[in-house]
C-alpha cells in the first residue's frame, strides 16, 4: 500500500468549497472511487491554522495510481484547475510505503456516509 500526501494552503473564504471538493462526497474522492485499487483518503484540517489542510490518498500500489492518473487525466486536470482557484499553495509532501498495515473491517473511509 502507498500513501500520497499533499499540504494545501486554502484562500480565505474558500474553505467550504475546498472541503466540498476533497471531502468524502466530493468530486475528487468520487473520481478516485472509479478505480478499485483506491483505498480511501484522510482529509485533515489544521486546528491552529485554518487555511492549512493535509490530504492523504491510499492506493494498493503505485502502478495503479499512475494508470489512474493517465486514464482519467482530462477529469483530473479539470478538478486540479478548480482546486488552483481555491488555494494559495500546494506542496506535495511525498509518496510513502506502508510498513505495517492493520486489518481493515468495514468500508474504506472514502465510502462511509
Regions found by a protein language model. Give the residues of each.
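Generic structural motif
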Residues: 11-13, 62, 101
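Glycine-rich beta-strand-turn "strand-cap" elements at beta-sheet edges
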Residues: 2, 39-53, 77-113
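An amphipathic, aromatic/His-enriched active-site/gating alpha helix that lines ligand/cofactor pockets
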Residues: 23-40, 58-96
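Short, surface-exposed ligand-recognition loops at beta-strand->loop->(often short) alpha-helix junctions
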Residues: 9-22
Amino acid at each position: 500500500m502507498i500513501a500520497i500526501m499533499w499540504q494545501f494552503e486554502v484562500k480565505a473564504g474558500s474553505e467550504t468549497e475546498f472541503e466540498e471538493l476533497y471531502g468524502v462526497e466530493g468530486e475528487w474522492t468520487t473520481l478516485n472511487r472509479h478505480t478499485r485499487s483506491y483505498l480511501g483518503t484522510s482529509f485533515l484540517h489544521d486546528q491552529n491554522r485554518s487555511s492549512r489542510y493535509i490530504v492523504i490518498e491510499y492506493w494498493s500500489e503505485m502502478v495503479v495510481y499512475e494508470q489512474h492518473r493517465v486514464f482519467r487525466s482530462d477529469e483530473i486536470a479539470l478538478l486540479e484547475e478548480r482546486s488552483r482557484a481555491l488555494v494559495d499553495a500546494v506542496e506535495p509532501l511525498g509518496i510513502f510505503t506502508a510498513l505495517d498495515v492493520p486489518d481493515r473491517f468495514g468500508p474504506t473511509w472514502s465510502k462511509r456516509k
